[in-house]
């Protein structure tokens, strides 16, 4: 079941009626079509007038797509690259090579996970120094092979643990920013 926000209560009512109509033996196609049109108009009206807090709520919705969902639906011939070549692989950052319309591109993104198991695996999307170094590595590879890079930004922020600080969290973040700003290949960020 989809979760609705308080400001979506009218949409939820229409969805409930549509579910009942779809489960009914005697389908009323005209009524379903009318309700779907009404629902679409409500979505347009509501989402064109969200206040700042409602925008935050939407951005944090538990059922919205995550980076891996986008990667799996946008790219073909996906090859994930792992590790920072210094310490470890940070699963909060996913990246690699893929194709869009038969053209190779690099991709990078923060992954939060969809279930408790995957959220733990991806550290709730909080990158450690090795994740930021993985980003640097992928940026440099994209530049070396003169391929565009697409990044997906959906971050909760850097991991605030003592071990991450001891391994150079601040420096890794700063260097990632420097490498990204100096990268001489087309880069697109999707937030």
Regions found by a protein language model. Name each.
Residues 1-191:
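Terminal-region recognition feature
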